[in-house]
Amino acid sequence: MKKRLFFTIAAMFTVTLSALAQYDDEYEIIVTDANGQRQEIDIPEAMTFEVDSMLNQYYSKTFLADDENCTTSSSDPEFTDQEYIDRLSRLPYVVPMPYNEIVRKFIDRYTKSGRRTVGYMIAAMNLYTPIFEQALETFGVPLELKYLPVVESGLNPSAVSHAGAAGLWQFMITSGKRYGLRVNSLVDDRRDPIKSSYAAAELLSDLYRIFGDWHLALAAYNCGPDNVNRAIHRAGGSKDYWTIYPYLPRETRGYVPAFIAANYVMNYYCEHKICPMRSTLPEKADTVMVDRDVSFKTISDYCGIPVEQLRALNPQYRRDVVNGSSEPSA
């Protein structure tokens, strides 16, 4: 297959989510367990990114704007636990969406301090959805897992974690290569929204085949199958996520609750008076096949497309060069 250059594709936002929160409580949530003990749960890294960093990037400033016909309220309406339970139970999902204090804390993170971030991510999610759903459907993975990149990367294809995971789905180099993603000096397919989505769907399918439970598969996606197996062993062989929960790595304990919260907020943002941002990105993609090296500068000069826009739409190319000649294929 010849190399592909995506000139315009609505789904490909590139924002650098680099600014982190200022205080310790921005990195963790505190709950009380069944024994009355204080429990500190790490917040996924993408949930600590500042919305101002997102909105100051080239693509956000060029193609996103607040909707003049809808204003996000400054405060979040209050709801009872039963209302949250009822809403989660109405979602037409295969993956269980239980409600508890931990899930509620993560919902509050999105609907209270993260209101502007949610408005941004809804706009981005509307555009990424076709890519995610097609990849998940190909491997028989429940479509609700399309919201996993909300937790993983904040929907930033160029996001890089402190551990070196990259892209929308936050692949490490080793796992990315195992699932066919090229990582070299010129190309990082972990940042390619399409290729990484298919790789993630295949990985999730494999993890479900191992554990037979979507919560455990999600935990393994975050911390690896070995850590989940160790937690199962320490929990006496139980394969219930909430039973093995205390034995999982600290950073993984908040992962499934954050995923449930992301599914909730992406479906019920209106009830919380959160307005999506308005996107002026084109709805169609134009693909050009190349079989030789072409620089972004050459493409920009020929097509009149700013280099910054080419970078934003093609985050997988690391040196502003589409390397069509390095790995020619049919």
Predicted regions and their residues:
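Extracellular LysM carbohydrate-binding repeats and other cell-envelope/extracellular binding modules
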Residues: 248, 313-330
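Catalytic cores of secreted or luminal carbohydrate-active enzymes
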Residues: 250-271, 327-329
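Extracytoplasmic/secreted proteins, especially bacterial periplasmic and envelope-associated proteins
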Residues: 102-105, 120, 124-127, 131, ...
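An acidic, Gly/Ser/Thr/Pro-rich helix-cap/linker signature
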Residues: 20-139
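Substrate-binding clefts and substrate-entry loops adjacent to catalytic sites
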Residues: 106-120, 154-162, 170-212, 232-246, ...
